[in-house]
């Protein structure tokens, strides 16, 4: 017979033992009862001590009887203290066992649920599924790359030639901007001689005037 069976009077192989919750509650009730007994004995010890002091000098026989009763109460109190310690230890152990039982029960329930969830799963099928997902992702990436590439629609150009032409245009634009910043180029004019041009000879001019006058006279007399 188990200790719990001996304590609570359950016996026989066919007898059903108390549940952990019932046993824990009974132990708590026992602790409460013993605590009240402790309080009662402590009061009795105080009373007997008062009685012994009261008859200490007047009635030694009554004082001795009071001290004997006090000793018996103290012995009972010590026994109850030990019993309470044992019951408290047993209750804590039973509570821990009950907690462990509940934890294991819940873990077992979770394990069964996990097993049921995995019953229709095959690791090979999972691997195949993950491989299919990876293949589809790779295909999707290839399609995205193909779509993002520019299409020439039959136009085939030399990239190097186009780049060279672009650089030439850029250089022309830079030169043009540079000229606009510096202003129009100043064209140097020919040097002007410092000395004055030689004047026409006065004599030659007079001769020309005389010739003109003679021609005029000849025309008038003709």
Curated annotation (Swiss-Prot):
One of its GO terms (biological process) is vesicle budding from membrane. Signal peptide: none annotated. It holds the Pfam family Snf7. It is a peripheral membrane protein. It is found in: Cytoplasm, Cytosol; Late endosome membrane; Midbody. The keyword Transport applies. The keyword Transcription does not apply. Keywords: Coiled coil, Cytoplasm, Endosome, Membrane, Protein transport, Transport. Its main location: cytoplasm. Residues 21-182 form a coiled coil. It comes from the Eukaryota. GO terms for cellular component: cytoplasmic side of plasma membrane; cytosol; ESCRT III complex; late endosome membrane; midbody; multivesicular body; nuclear envelope. Residues 1-21, 177-222 are annotated as: Disordered. Belongs to the SNF7 family. PANTHER family: CHARGED MULTIVESICULAR BODY PROTEIN, CHARGED MULTIVESICULAR BODY PROTEIN 4B. Probable core component of the endosomal sorting required for transport complex III (ESCRT-III) which is involved in multivesicular bodies (MVBs) formation and sorting of endosomal cargo proteins into MVBs. MVBs contain intraluminal vesicles (ILVs) that are generated by invagination and scission from the limiting membrane of the endosome and mostly are delivered to lysosomes enabling degradation of membrane proteins, such as stimulated growth factor receptors, lysosomal enzymes and lipids. Probable core component of the endosomal sorting required for transport complex III (ESCRT-III). ESCRT-III components are thought to multimerize to form a flat lattice on the perimeter membrane of the endosome. This is Charged multivesicular body protein 4b. The gene is chmp4b.
